[in-house]
Amino acid sequence: MNITIISVGKIKEKYLEDAVLEYKKRLSRYTKLNIIEISDEKTPENPSDVEKSKILDKEAEGIFKNLKGDFYVVTLEILGKELDSKELAKNINDLSISGKKNIVFVIGGSLGLSQKVSEKSNFKLSFSKMTFPHQLMRVILLEQIYRSFRIINGEPYHK
């Protein structure tokens, strides 16, 4: 199975970069992981709805450029379905068993995701009703994917 994370924005803080590298290393024994960073658009201080829409559409273009092929697309959205770690592991395992070879997780930028991207999603996943910085969300997602593979393989994990 191949896991791809498409994330709007780049990680700037070294401690978050280090965490991403650590989880990439840990995940390498379970899956091929690819992380794609899409440039985030500069957002004015108080953007109008028109400005927000233009920014989201531009970011969506970058996301769609990387969604060519047979992917099962999971978007991270506040209004998505909340799963516990075992449910996420079951979903990943079920996709693998059903023959899905490529899962793509999409993390939006500071304004979230374009409706166009959300509409292309096979599954909308929510980690919380709270908002997290996209850089931190990437680390949280990687940890949960790692935890999922530990669960799938019957290996111990922290509860």
Swiss-Prot record:
It is found in: Cytoplasm. It is an enzyme of class 2 (transferase). S-adenosyl-L-methionine binds at L76, G108, F127, S128, K129, M130, T131, F132. Its EC number is 2.1.1.177. NCBIfam families: PRK00103.1-3 (NF000985), tRNA_RlmH_YbeA (TIGR00246). This is Putative ribosomal RNA large subunit methyltransferase H. The gene is rlmH. GO terms for cellular component: cytoplasm. Belongs to the RNA methyltransferase RlmH family. HAMAP family: 23SrRNA_methyltr_H. One of its GO terms (molecular function) is rRNA (pseudouridine-N3-)-methyltransferase activity. It catalyses: pseudouridine(1915) in 23S rRNA + S-adenosyl-L-methionine = N(3)-methylpseudouridine(1915) in 23S rRNA + S-adenosyl-L-homocysteine + H(+). Keywords: Cytoplasm, Methyltransferase, rRNA processing, S-adenosyl-L-methionine, Transferase. Specifically methylates the pseudouridine at position 1915 (m3Psi1915) in 23S rRNA. It comes from Methanococcus vannielii (strain ATCC 35089 / DSM 1224 / JCM 13029 / OCM 148 / SB).
